[in-house]
């Protein structure tokens, strides 16, 4: 039976690992054992940071867009909400490059001046006018025209409070309302919980 030698395969395997460990400090680039340990650890770091890099760049883009929006007197949330309403399909990477490289970046985006008006909350006040109630005056035939007393016409107008759609409001606006209506622990609640708490508070005031 012929003798089998694994020397060539073992040599290729070790040579491959040492090639991947080229440039490492000390024995991590020369000895196979320590080089293999460091290469395995480096591959784990590379796998983890391929995911982490996407998160880090998103944070960087948001901070740059926010800085550019503050120069125009806007907030990041208002800007992104306004761009969605105006159907401007520009991603955060491009917006961050505009804010970082060009002066007055956000102003160059289309419809930004219109967005400031559209994104500001402007509740529409709806007033329902009731028909005028005219108090009829009874005139007596015996009295003359000079002595007639007519009661003034009275109009009763009840203005309803504007019906706010709480679900369409932003989170910081809901927190302001919750602070005004003294909702307990509103800063710890989520958006849906704040909406339900505000509805209960408004219902109590109406009653």
Curated annotation (Swiss-Prot):
Q: Which InterPro entries match?
A: Rho-like_N (IPR011112), Rho_N_sf (IPR036269), Ribosomal_bL20 (IPR005813), Ribosomal_protein_bL20_C (IPR035566)
Q: Respond yes or no to whether keyword rRNA-binding is given for this record.
A: yes
Q: Where is region (Disordered) located?
A: 117-161
Alphabetically list the UniProt keywords: Ribonucleoprotein, Ribosomal protein, RNA-binding, rRNA-binding
Q: Where is the composition biased (Basic and acidic residues)?
A: 140-149
Provide any one GO MF term from the record: rRNA binding
Q: Name one GO biological process term.
A: translation
**Cross-referenced SMART domains:** Rho_N (SM00959)
Annotated S-S bridges: none
Do you know which SUPFAM superfamilies this protein is assigned to? Rho N-terminal domain-like (SSF68912), Ribosomal protein L20 (SSF74731)
Q: List, alphabetically, the CDD domains matched.
A: Ribosomal_L20
Q: Name one GO cellular component term.
A: ribonucleoprotein complex
Member of which family?
Belongs to the bacterial ribosomal protein bL20 family.
User: What this chain does, per the record?
Assistant: Binds directly to 23S ribosomal RNA and is necessary for the in vitro assembly process of the 50S ribosomal subunit. It is not involved in the protein synthesizing functions of that subunit.
Know the name of this protein?
Answer: Large ribosomal subunit protein bL20
Task: State the organism's lineage.
Answer: Bacteria, Bacillati, Mycoplasmatota, Mollicutes, Acholeplasmatales
Question: What gene makes this protein?
Answer: rplT
């Amino acid at each position: 039976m012929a003798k089998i030698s694994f020397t060539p395969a073992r040599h290729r395997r070790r040579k491959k690992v040492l090639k991947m460990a080229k440039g490492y400090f000390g024995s991590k680039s020369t000895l196979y054992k320590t080089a293999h340990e460091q290469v395995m650890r480096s591959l784990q770091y590379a796998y983890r940071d391929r995911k982490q890099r996407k998160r880090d760049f998103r944070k960087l883009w948001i901070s740059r867009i926010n800085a550019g929006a503050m120069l125009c007197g806007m907030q990041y949330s208002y800007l992104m909400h306004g761009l969605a309403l105006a159907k401007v399909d520009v991603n955060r990477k491009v917006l961050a490059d505009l804010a970082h490289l060009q002066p007055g970046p956000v102003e160059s985006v289309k419809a930004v001046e219109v967005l400031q008006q559209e994104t500001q909350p402007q509740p529409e006040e709806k007033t329902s006018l009731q028909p005028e109630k005219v108090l009829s005056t009874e005139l007596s035939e015996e009295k003359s025209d000079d002595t007639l007393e007519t009661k003034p016409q009275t109009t009763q107008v009840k203005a309803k409070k504007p019906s706010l759609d709480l679900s369409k409001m932003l989170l910081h606006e809901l927190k302001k309302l919750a602070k005004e209506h003294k909702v307990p622990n509103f800063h710890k609640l989520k958006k849906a919980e704040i909406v339900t708490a505000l509805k209960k508070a408004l219902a109590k005031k109406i009653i």
